[in-house]
Amino acid sequence: MGCFGYLLLIIGLHQVLATYPIWWSLAVGQQYSSLGTQPIPCGTIPGLVAKQMRFCRNYMEIMPSVAEGVKIGIQECQHQFRGRRWNCTTVNDNLAIFGPVLDKATRESAFVHAIASAGVAFAVTRSCAEGSATICGCDTHHKGPPGEGWKWGGCSEDMDFGSMVSREFADARENRPDARSAMNRHNNEAGRTSILDHRHLKCKCHGLSGSCEVKTCWWSQPDFRVIGDYLKDKYDSASEMVVEKHRESRGWVETLRPKYTFFKPPIERDLIYYESSPNFCEPNPETGSFGTRDRECNVTSHGIDGCDLLCCGRGQNTRTEKRKEKCHCIFHWCCYVSCQECMRVYDVHTCK
């Protein structure tokens, strides 16, 4: 990112950090990447509120999974938005890892909160099933009798425990009576719910000579790409809300209601937002936009990844690029494939 990345952090930093989940820096911090499955000292994690600090100390052995969950959430965000004007760019080695871009209550902020919350639930659940933590394990509450021709067996992944960890930790700082906290809580829960909604049975056959005399089944999480695809669809159809203020015994409270009453109101699985997104065409330190100059675009696409839209009408530059690829592959009996290496020339298009 260079100097511009640091400039993004400086502009409006005070406002950003007031509501920013700074603990997301666990996902990119150099000091945590080398720890592997070793416990993370709670005092070294920036931005924890008191409830998060207590949780960290009580469940220290699963904190590496929390960090891993945020990391896979960010990686999935970058995959889902790889062809869009905002591509989930992070500002490494800074507390506000996305810069000011998430300071606004936009669709992008809704997606990032949902995918990060889902990532934490996913990683903790996986860690428990793999036996990496002593405080959790397989789910023994199978939620229903077995079906015809199979019985419960194996290790059902305890998705309820993973969701609990995500809820207790990620939502701990979202306790303010304002609209942004309400939005973040809703989108965090939408992310967690997506995992439970996409769980599925995995089964294994047992018997002589490959027969399936006995079949054992267990609950399994979906592949995280399934969650990313699903939440990306929810991003595209996110519900716009408006902020309402009313007075309660504890003071002024902000709540959210749908902006358009003729649409179906959002449910817990939907993403919500209440501020418009910038167009992300040009660099803007105040909004956190890096612009799209020099971004690679698809000259044949009419979608958002196409040069017309991604480059915001500025046009594109074209250069040729040589790439080594495997070619003339031959299957040999038995059993391997040999290939030659060919040099091929491609046109690469980047935004002006």
Curated annotation (Swiss-Prot):
<keyword id="KW-0325">Glycoprotein</keyword>
<keyword id="KW-0879">Wnt signaling pathway</keyword>
<feature type="lipid moiety-binding region" description="O-palmitoleoyl serine">
    <location>
        <position position="209"/>
    </location>
</feature>
<dbReference type="InterPro" id="IPR018161">
    <property type="entry name" value="Wnt_CS"/>
</dbReference>
<keyword id="KW-0217">Developmental protein</keyword>
<dbReference type="InterPro" id="IPR005817">
    <property type="entry name" value="Wnt"/>
</dbReference>
<feature type="glycosylation site" description="N-linked (GlcNAc...) asparagine">
    <location>
        <position position="298"/>
    </location>
</feature>
<dbReference type="GO" id="GO:0016055">
    <property type="term" value="P:Wnt signaling pathway"/>
</dbReference>
<feature type="disulfide bond">
    <location>
        <begin position="77"/>
        <end position="88"/>
    </location>
</feature>
<feature type="glycosylation site" description="N-linked (GlcNAc...) asparagine">
    <location>
        <position position="87"/>
    </location>
</feature>
<dbReference type="GO" id="GO:0005615">
    <property type="term" value="C:extracellular space"/>
</dbReference>
<dbReference type="Pfam" id="PF00110">
    <property type="entry name" value="wnt"/>
</dbReference>
<keyword id="KW-0272">Extracellular matrix</keyword>
<feature type="disulfide bond">
    <location>
        <begin position="329"/>
        <end position="339"/>
    </location>
</feature>
<protein>
    <recommendedName>
        <fullName>Protein Wnt-3a</fullName>
    </recommendedName>
</protein>
<dbReference type="GO" id="GO:0005125">
    <property type="term" value="F:cytokine activity"/>
</dbReference>
<keyword id="KW-1015">Disulfide bond</keyword>
<comment type="function">
    <text>Ligand for members of the frizzled family of seven transmembrane receptors. Functions in the canonical Wnt signaling pathway that results in activation of transcription factors of the TCF/LEF family. Required for normal embryonic mesoderm development and formation of caudal somites. Required for normal morphogenesis of the developing neural tube.</text>
</comment>
<feature type="disulfide bond">
    <location>
        <begin position="297"/>
        <end position="312"/>
    </location>
</feature>
<keyword id="KW-0732">Signal</keyword>
<feature type="disulfide bond">
    <location>
        <begin position="327"/>
        <end position="342"/>
    </location>
</feature>
<dbReference type="GO" id="GO:0045944">
    <property type="term" value="P:positive regulation of transcription by RNA polymerase II"/>
</dbReference>
<feature type="signal peptide">
    <location>
        <begin position="1"/>
        <end position="18"/>
    </location>
</feature>
<dbReference type="InterPro" id="IPR009141">
    <property type="entry name" value="Wnt3"/>
</dbReference>
<dbReference type="GO" id="GO:0045165">
    <property type="term" value="P:cell fate commitment"/>
</dbReference>
<dbReference type="GO" id="GO:0060070">
    <property type="term" value="P:canonical Wnt signaling pathway"/>
</dbReference>
<feature type="disulfide bond">
    <location>
        <begin position="138"/>
        <end position="155"/>
    </location>
</feature>
<dbReference type="GO" id="GO:0005109">
    <property type="term" value="F:frizzled binding"/>
</dbReference>
<comment type="similarity">
    <text>Belongs to the Wnt family.</text>
</comment>
<feature type="disulfide bond">
    <location>
        <begin position="203"/>
        <end position="217"/>
    </location>
</feature>
<feature type="disulfide bond">
    <location>
        <begin position="128"/>
        <end position="136"/>
    </location>
</feature>
<feature type="disulfide bond">
    <location>
        <begin position="205"/>
        <end position="212"/>
    </location>
</feature>
<keyword id="KW-0964">Secreted</keyword>
<dbReference type="InterPro" id="IPR043158">
    <property type="entry name" value="Wnt_C"/>
</dbReference>
<keyword id="KW-0449">Lipoprotein</keyword>
<dbReference type="GO" id="GO:0014033">
    <property type="term" value="P:neural crest cell differentiation"/>
</dbReference>
<dbReference type="GO" id="GO:0030182">
    <property type="term" value="P:neuron differentiation"/>
</dbReference>
<feature type="disulfide bond">
    <location>
        <begin position="334"/>
        <end position="335"/>
    </location>
</feature>
